[in-house]
Regions:
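Structural detector for helix-capping/boundary residues
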Residues: 11-14, 41, 122, 143
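Short amphipathic coiled-coil heptad-repeat segments
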Residues: 1-8, 174-184
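Extracellular/lumenal glycan-associated surfaces
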Residues: 159-171, 175
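Short, recurring structural edge motifs at helix starts
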Residues: 1-3, 25, 59, 135-137, ...
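Non-catalytic DNA-recognition/assembly elements of restriction-modification systems
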Residues: 2-22, 147
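A short glycine-rich beta-alpha junction/loop motif
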Residues: 95-102, 132-156
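Short, ligand-facing micro-motifs at secondary-structure edges
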Residues: 44-57, 72-97, 113-117, 126-130
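Sequence-specific dsDNA recognition surfaces
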Residues: 14-26, 41-69
């Protein structure tokens, strides 16, 4: 029997990625000009599947965590289990990654954009929500992320899916800008 080249594979996230955390920056550390930084709050206030423009800056501290490129970010804390289950891909390197961020570095077989879409929707979003712990503030740990079950097609298919969502995101952004500019 020949293997279907379009079949999706199943794996645990911990089998295809390594995990780390951002390091301690807060809104008080932001400056008008400096090194670009992503704080965990951005994943709530300016959520994007792919973060490709950064509008917050800081002065770099010792032992800062700097993006290598192609990571996926998930908040480590939030107000609700549903809210915390969201992910964003960061393709650029050289960006400071602030505290309260779970950082996923893909080792093989996965597109960061596809992974961010997958973790933010459907069964994986539900699985992340169930793993979040806490009452008034919920937390999601990297050890929780390692056991998330993923289904994924081949890398070329993931890239096609990611490209489609990127076009949709850009179209939505364009329409939002036009809507904001238009008079009532």
């Amino acid at each position: 029997m020949t293997k279907n080249p379009y079949a999706w594979e199943k794996c645990k996230l911990g089998e295809v990625a390594r995990f780390s955390k951002g390091s301690g920056y807060s809104k008080n550390d932001l400056v008008e000009h400096g090194k670009p930084i992503i704080l965990y709050g951005r994943l709530y206030t300016n959520y994007q599947t792919i973060i490709d423009e950064i509008d917050t800056f800081t002065v770099e501290k010792n032992k800062s965590v700097i993006s290598e490129g192609n990571e996926v970010l998930i908040p480590a804390s939030g107000e609700s289990a549903e809210e915390i289950a969201r992910a964003s891909a960061i393709e650029k390197s050289g960006i400071i990654l602030g505290g309260d961020l779970n950082i996923i570095k893909i080792l093989t077989k996965l597109s960061p954009h596809f992974l961010a879409i997958t973790l933010s929707n459907g069964n994986q979003k539900l699985e992340l929500s169930k793993k979040a712990q806490g009452k008034s503030v919920v937390h999601l740990r990297n050890s929780d992320l390692e056991t998330v079950v993923l289904l994924h097609p081949t890398l070329p298919e993931q890239q096609k899916i990611g490209a489609l969502f990127r076009r949709l995101d850009r179209l939505i952004t364009l329409h939002k800008r036009e809507w904001i500019k238009s008079p009532l």
